[in-house]
UniProtKB/Swiss-Prot annotation:
SUPFAM superfamilies: Alanine racemase C-terminal domain-like, PLP-binding barrel. It comes from Xanthomonas campestris pv. campestris (strain ATCC 33913 / DSM 3586 / NCPPB 528 / LMG 568 / P 25). InterPro entries: Ala_racemase/Decarboxylase_C, Arg_decarb_HB, Arg_decarbox_C, Arg_decrbxlase, De-COase2_CS, De-COase2_N, Orn/DAP/Arg_de-COase, PLP-binding_barrel. It catalyses: L-arginine + H(+) = agmatine + CO2. The keyword Iron does not apply. The modification N6-(pyridoxal phosphate)lysine is found at K99. Belongs to the Orn/Lys/Arg decarboxylase class-II family. SpeA subfamily. Substrate binds at V279, D280, V281, G282, G283, G284, L285, G286, I287, D288, Y289. This is Biosynthetic arginine decarboxylase.
């Protein structure tokens, strides 16, 4: 591809459209990372090499904590601008729900951005224990999820310790528990109520909002709750209105519709006498994983400023119309804060190339299917390409049927495949996406004629949403982008599971069933980056085939370059076996017994013992040595 350029590389992998300025390509063909808008760009391959020199192994999760601060700052700036645009004086707090990524390096980095404009959310007792320690003095903590007395008591203790904890009532039964514990501790609770909106944002997570939502009160339940509360000493404690429109909302109109409905609840509760000082709109702010800037479920058709404006404007108008004091706006946009900051790097372990096909020598006793396929191949440059492929499919299917019925032997069966794939390659060379009639056949051929790149990672551990909900993540080779990719491939992981594959790829501002990739060079490692994996993936990852957590590093970038600020070793085999109930002492004893029973020479026995011990304490993934 003689016209290949760095701009062509950027376009092929849609980098400008999903990277949001944090990732680019340099003159050496390396993916570079720029954590701060005005800061230096660092080569991702160089960072990985430095991490490996320090002892890290592939697959490797690379975190850039500076991006976390940048994302939070952009979100706060967008709301500051929207409040100025709409003359809104209520203020704004960006709350981080730590369920998105509970790792100390993530939640702690965000929590270090002290100030009234940041808070934390917990949805369980372990999460609450973390945020009680992470929160700044006087910090906002939103307490969601199912609650028992202990959870409620811990949240109320947070109030006693000077934290601004709000216990959000999401089930009618929770209110009495909160009031009983508040009286027992002699503390005035901060109460919130979660409304179940009828409006919801379309998408993969749409049932987290709307009438089918797992949490939240109906209008009747909210009225009953207020009646139970208004005549108590805690009537003025109901200060937070919470709702959730959905996660990863693709269409900005869904946000506007949800806010229109939610604002009505704020007005009505205020009219009834509730002192609503905070409106928590939940999550919903999406990430453009695809780079298509569309209403597709893995994309968004809006930006930060549009999102903020659609939140602020309805509340500003309602407060002005009804003479209400503007409440403090709270969002829980954890995905938008964290997705960009982490990249998974994994090496290709093997490539299975697509069949090239060939034309076998002719024989007088050839079955009819082979004769017909040979005739089709001879006419590749003469007849319409689509018509030729359709005929080839027919005779290929006839040949497969004949083999299954025992009418032809294995040699003939192999020749049928050889001819079919030779025809397929010849047909594809004549097709063009510019011709509408060619596109269905070209799509089919691109799916058939692809290489399988076996990559040293687990889909289920590192990008589980790919398997669970067909989530799309940008995938890019982290080097050689100054070379034209000559192959098309699909990515398969190391698990013994046919679902351990990536089926959808970001390419040229669209989606495809395969990805342009380079052929492997002997002795060189070919490393692939999985981007925007900082939200949910680590936390949701499972241990299929006992592949565990990967090695991870945190990289700090400043004006002088970068440094590996922190390194965490991934799971080893003994850790995974212990997790699923194996007694390590028993395993070691069994190995020793079997070595002894083999009656080997002492030196050989020691070699086997050392190899088994190394296997037991080693990384769960494959060696990351270059192929060839």
């Amino acid at each position: 591809m003689s016209d290949w350029s760095l701009d062509q590389a950027r376009k092929t992998y849609s980098i400008p459209h999903w990277a949001d300025g944090y990732f680019d390509v340099n003159d050496a063909g390396h993916v570079v990372v720029r954590p701060t808008a005005d800061g230096p760009a660092v080569s991702l391959p160089e960072v990985v090499d430095a991490a490996r020199a320090a002892g890290a192994k592939l697959p490797l999760l690379v975190r850039f904590p500076d991006i976390l601060g940048q994302r939070l700052g952009k979100l706060q700036a967008a709301f500051a601008q929207a409040q100025a645009d709409w003359d809104y004086a209520g203020g704004y707090t960006a709350v981080y729900p730590i369920k998105v990524n509970q790792h100390r390096g993530v939640a702690g980095t965000l929590a270090s951005h002290h100030g009234e404009g940041f808070g934390l959310e917990a949805g369980s007792k372990p999460e609450l224990m973390a945020v009680l320690a992470l929160s700044r003095p006087g910090g906002l903590i939103v307490c969601n999820g199912y609650k028992d007395r202990e959870y409620i008591r811990l949240a109320l203790i947070g109030r006693k310790l000077g934290l601004q904890t709000f216990i959000v009532i999401e089930k009618p039964s929770e209110l009495n528990l909160v009031l009983e514990e508040a009286r027992a501790l002699d503390v005035k609770p901060g109460l919130g109520v979660r409304m179940r909106l009828a409006s919801l944002g379309a998408g993969k997570w749409q049932n987290s909002g709307g009438d089918k939502a797992k949490f939240g009160l109906s209008p009747r339940q909210v009225l009953d709750l207020w009646k139970s509360l208004r005549d108590t000493e805690y009537a003025d404690s109901l200060n937070l209105l919470h709702f959730h429109m959905g996660s990863q909302i693709s269409n900005v109109r869904d946000i506007a519709n949800g806010m229109r409905e939610a604002t009505r609840y704020f007005v009505e509760l205020s009219r009834l006498g509730a002192k609503i000082s905070h409106v928590d709109v939940g999550g919903g702010l999406g990430i453009d994983y695809e780079g298509t800037r569309s209403r597709s479920y893995c994309s968004i058709n809006y930006g930060l400023h549009s999102y903020a404006s659609n939140i602020v404007q309805p509340l500003a108008s309602a407060c002005e119309e009804h003479g209400l004091p503007p409440p403090r706006i709270v969002t829980e946009c954890g995905r938008a804060m964290t997705a960009h900051h982490a990249v998974l790097i994994a090496n290709v372990s093997e490539v299975e190339q697509a069949p090239e096909g060939r034309v076998p020598d002719a024989h007088d006793d050839e079955p009819a299917a082979i004769r017909h396929l040979r005739e089709i191949h001879d006419e590749l440059d003469v007849r319409p390409a689509v018509e030729l492929f359709q005929e080839a499919q027919h005779f290929h299917a006839e040949g497969l049927s004949a083999y299954a019925l025992g009418q032809i032997d294995l040699t003939h069966r192999a020749r049928i495949d050889d001819l079919f794939y030779a025809i397929a390659h010849g047909v594809r060379a004549r097709l063009s996406f510019d011709e509408k009639s060619h596109r269905p056949v070209l799509d089919e051929l691109n799916e058939r004629l692809v290489d399988k790149y076996f990559v040293n990672f687990s889909v289920f551990e590192s990008i589980p949403d790919v398997w669970a909900i067909d989530q799309v993540f940008p995938i890019v080779p982290i080097e050689r982008l100054n070379e034209a990719p000559q192959r098309r491939g699909i990515i398969a992981d190391m698990t013994c599971d046919s679902d351990g594959m990536v089926k959808t790829y970001v390419e040229n501002e669209s989606l495809d069933s395969s990805l342009p990739l380079h052929g492997l060079n002997p002795g060189e490692s070919y490393r692939i980056g999985f981007f925007l994996v900082g939200a949910y993936q680590e936390i949701l990852g499972d241990i299929h085939n006992l592949f565990g957590d990967t090695d991870a590093v945190e990289v700090a970038v400043d004006g002088t370059g970068y440094r590996i600020a922190q390194q965490r070793r991934g799971d080893t085999t003994d850790v995974m076996l212990d997790y699923v109930g194996y007694q390590l002492d028993t395993l070691r004893a069994t190995y020793a017994e079997r070595i002894a029973a083999a009656q080997l020479p002492p030196e050989r026995a020691q070699e086997l013992h050392d190899a088994l011990e190394a296997g037991l304490t080693g990384y769960t993934y494959l060696s990351d040595e270059p192929l060839g």
